[in-house]
Amino acid sequence: MAKTLYEKLFDAHVVYEAQNETPLLYIDRHLVHEVTSPQAFDGLRAHGRPVRQPGKTFATMDHNVSTQTKDINASGEMARIQMQELIKNCKAFGVELYDLNHPYQGIVHVMGPEQGVTLPGMTIVCGDSHTATHGAFGALAFGIGTSEVEHVLATQTLKQGRAKTMKIEVKGTAAPGITAKDIVLAIIGKTGSAGGTGHVVEFCGEAIRNLSMEGRMTLCNMAIEMGAKAGLVAPDDTTFNYVKGRLHAPKGSDFDDAVAYWKTLKTDDGATFDTVVTLQAEDIAPQVTWGTNPGQVISVNDNIPDPASFADPVERASAEKALAYMGLKPGIPLTDVAIDKVFIGSCTNSRIEDLRAAAEIAKGRKVAPGVQALVVPGSGPVKAQAEAEGLDKIFIEAGFEWRLPGCSMCLAMNNDRLNPGERCASTSNRNFEGRQGRGGRTHLVSPAMAAAAAVTGHFADIRSIK
């Protein structure tokens, strides 16, 4: 029987399945951070259980960390406690930890791929909703809750029901300057923020194949923002070339054997999907969200929509509420909207390719008066590579702040946050009310678009910036 990539991955990991019971899946990799793990480790301790597979469990600090100092006390008491608990727990249970002083420390979804922890064909979980990022490698990756974190630590398995399947095909070639972030925002604009609910999404088509691994990670990272359980891209030579030589990747003949298997990880001809969505890449312009969910998105040269233009009463009410929160009036050009802060970073857009794109816009320009702009590399290795290429100097000379790795302003769990009423052009993944700080107003954009907003002081079309 012809199978989709998702069905192949799922079926290959079923440990036990009985009639009318949820299947039990084997988990190949478990990624851990400081926020969702303390209670899980406490549960193990209370029952006298070890971590079943410490060699398949990898931990880092990212959510709470300060991006201005490596001092564990810098982000407040709760953050300090969570980070100290992670240090204690990893030591007690034999789990490898990339702490604040480790050169590999960084955002968990940046660290995993760059260390070769993430490999095609795997099941990967983490107590974090954006675990979908790792699906870019043709791995079945999804976020789990703290009680499930404990279950995986104890058993290396997880009960998981089968999801519906969705194919999103992006046909043709994207125009110059159009990034994976623009593509995924355009997709969510079409599906809505709940269009993928109950599904695992496979992204395919020429425009997807043309993306780098960094771009594919951006794409799969935001699959969750359309309500999907996970996102997938079938592995190919781009994947294999990225993985080869990384710390935890197979070596020598083992790598060749792995690639032979990885090449089978694709949807069979004749396999059917429950839902199919198609977009034309050439129709996609630079995207900017205007509302309070990622599906409320328009092209940069569009006007802020009028809620009255939405036929669906729920969408209309949502638009009215969003515009009130965002402090925007219908009909005004998006390019007239001024910004206060810019955040370039997060598990969506903090990799070297993202920083290069932003630096290209920043080079030879200055951050607009009154704008604070942060650039936060996703990991120690990304930071080191950017500095080796001189990107830090470009940013600093332009007036951007060059920070230490961490989740930073993506979420208000550390010192980097918006004040009430402040408007931010952000390369992160969520523009919910209060996501970047109470009363903060978030607009999601690509790294180049964020840099353009920083130097102009408002949203600007990168295609018109020479």
UniProtKB/Swiss-Prot annotation:
Reaction(s) the record says it catalyses: (2R,3S)-3-isopropylmalate = (2S)-2-isopropylmalate
Protein keywords = 4Fe-4S, Amino-acid biosynthesis, Branched-chain amino acid biosynthesis, Iron, Iron-sulfur, Leucine biosynthesis, Lyase, Metal-binding
Q: Identify the metabolic or biological route this protein is part of.
A: Amino-acid biosynthesis; L-leucine biosynthesis; L-leucine from 3-methyl-2-oxobutanoate: step 2/4
Name what cofactor the protein needs.
[4Fe-4S] cluster
**Which biological process, per GO, is one annotated for this protein?**
L-leucine biosynthetic process
Q: In which domain of life is the source organism classified?
A: Bacteria
- The reply to whether Zinc figures as a keyword in the UniProt entry is no
Q: Name one Pfam family in it.
A: Aconitase
Q: How does it assemble?
A: Heterodimer of LeuC and LeuD.
Name the record gives this protein: 3-isopropylmalate dehydratase large subunit
